[in-house]
Amino acid sequence: MPLLLRRFPSPSVVSSFFLRRSMASSTISSDIITPSNTKIGWIGTGVMGRSMCGHLIKAGYTVTVFNRTISKAQTLIDMGANVADSPNSVAEQSDVVFTIVGYPSDVRHVLLDPKSGALSGLRQGGVLVDMTTSEPSLAEEIAKAASFKNCFSIDAPVSGGDLGAKNGKLSIFAGGDETTVKRLDPLFSLMGKVNFMGTSGKGQFAKLANQITIASTMLGLVEGLIYAHKAGLDVKKFLEAISTGAAGSKSIDLYGDRILKRDFDPGFYVNHFVKDLGICLNECQRMGLALPGLALAQQLYLSLKAHGEGDLGTQALLLALERLNNVSVQSSDS
C-alpha cells in the first residue's frame, strides 16, 4: 500500500501544533487537538494496540500505523489507516506518535534507533507517547532525548486488559510534562481515563505498582477457587457470592467467568506479565524493598512459561495452582 506523504514546511519556518502552544500559552484554551489539526502515528497493533488505535480512527483522526507483522494491522487498514514501513516513516507523517509494544528492548528500538526510530523522524514540537509497560529509567531516557530535539515524550502505560481496550475504559498512567498530558486529553479520553502521576517515569512506576497489585489479586482469586473446589462448593455460585462482598475485585469481573469456562485466551499475555513482574523485582532490588507476594507470583507465572503456556492470558495462573495441588477446577456449567 503506498504511503500518503505530506509536505511540511521546515521547522525553522513554522513550528508544530505542540511547540506553538508551548510558546504561546494564550492559545491553549482555543487551540484544542482535533482530527483536522493533528495527525496520529501508531506503532504496535497487538491485542491492546489494535483496539486503542481503532478508537482514534473511529473519531476521525488520520492515523498512520506500523507493525512488524503487517497482518496484525489489517483491521486498522480496513478502517482507513495508512501504513508505513518503519517507525521513522510513521513519525515523519505524524504530530503525535503512540507506541505499545512488547518489551523495553522493543521500545528502545522503535523510538530511539538512530536510523529507523520514531524520534529520528519526528519534527520539532512533536510528541511521543509510549503506552508499553516498560522501565522507568528508559522513560526518563526517552524524555531527555526528545527534549534535546525540542520534542515531547510522555510515558502512559495502561491497565484494563483487552476488554478495557475494546470498550475505551482503560486506566492510563501518565508521566511527563503535565501541560502536554492535558493537551493530549482529547486523544486519551477516547481510550480511557488519564491519571497524571508526575514527571517522566512516574507513569511507569504507577503501572508497575498496579501490576504488583494485580499479581496478588489474581493469586488470591485462583487460590480461593481451588479451595472452594476442594471443599465441594459449586465454584460458579461461590464466585457470584464473593463478587458483591469484600472479596469482590476487578480481577473477578474481568476474568472470573473466563476462568470458569477455562477460557485462557490472552487479554494480556503471560509472557508480558512475566516481563512486567521482572521489572518490578529489579526496581524492588534497586529500592531495597522486600515484596514476597510479588516474588511468589513471579515464580508461579514463570512455571507457566516453563510449561509452554506463555502465550496464554494471565488468568491461566489457575493451571499452575492446579498442577501444584493435582486438582482441576470445573464449574457445574462446564
From Swiss-Prot:
Enzyme category, top tier: oxidoreductase
GO molecular function: 3-hydroxyisobutyrate dehydrogenase activity; NAD binding; NADP binding
Keyword terms: Acetylation, Branched-chain amino acid catabolism, Mitochondrion, NAD, Oxidoreductase, Transit peptide
GO-annotated cellular components: mitochondrion
SUPFAM superfamilies xrefs: 6-phosphogluconate dehydrogenase C-terminal domain-like, NAD(P)-binding Rossmann-fold domains
Record pathway: Amino-acid degradation; L-valine degradation
The protein's Enzyme Commission number: 1.1.1.31
N-acetylalanine PTM sites in chain numbering: A24
A biological process from GO: valine catabolic process
Binding, NAD(+): 38-67, 133, 275
Reactions accelerated catalytically: 3-hydroxy-2-methylpropanoate + NAD(+) = 2-methyl-3-oxopropanoate + NADH + H(+)
Location of this chain's protein in the cell: Mitochondrion
Catalytic residue list: K207
Transit peptide: 1-23
Family membership: Belongs to the HIBADH-related family. 3-hydroxyisobutyrate dehydrogenase subfamily.
Protein name: Probable 3-hydroxyisobutyrate dehydrogenase-like 1, mitochondrial
Species the sequence originates in: Arabidopsis thaliana (Mouse-ear cress)
Lineage of producing organism: Eukaryota, Viridiplantae, Streptophyta, Embryophyta, Tracheophyta
